[in-house]
Amino acid sequence: MAYERKEISIEAIRRQEDICREIYDSFVSQKNRPLAMVDTYGCQQNEADSEKLRGYLAEMGYGFTHDEFEADVIVVNTCAVREHAEMRVLGNVGQLNHSKKQRPGQIIAVCGCMVQQEHMVEKIKKSYPVVDLVFGPHELWRFPELLLKTMTSHKRVFAAEKSDGYVAEGMPLKRDSSVKAWLSIMYGCNNFCTYCVVPYVRGRERSRRPEDIVA
């Protein structure tokens, strides 16, 4: 069956930006700027995704830190290509209970390929109560909405639905370097090679339009 390319509308992205402003406004009365930490595992695509996560967080008014004991929000962007990477992530996520004990209001989010797998979501639900928010790569574009829901509901939020994937343009970016950037031209894969998890967690192959790549 042929895959139908699906694109997130620019209006939907704008709604996420409105939520960013809503979160930003909620921090105005605070004396100190809130801080976020984005911890990235895996491939260059994850690096590119983390630039989008940081872009959204910057729009919300967050500064950035590499110290989990300073962070108000921690986002762990995970990899699923090798079992060792998954075990490393889970070990490090488990250690975050120390920072959360020191900062009870700290929000810990786990996203990326690892949590696109149903068994990993169930494992986090049962064994990692320190985690407040879980979302797969197909839900990255609505990170502000999911974070706000976590903040306001005071309940754990899980959003890792099965999907062939989307193309979402127009998300804000915050890059670590002023001289280089991760530039995605396509997402997913159609090959379904033996032992490869990529099509199952990243979805079907879909390309960005040339005009969006060079914009």
Question: For each of these PLM feature ranges, what is it?
Answer:
Residues 1-215:
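Proteins enriched for Cys/Gly/acidic motifs involved in redox and nucleic-acid/cofactor modification
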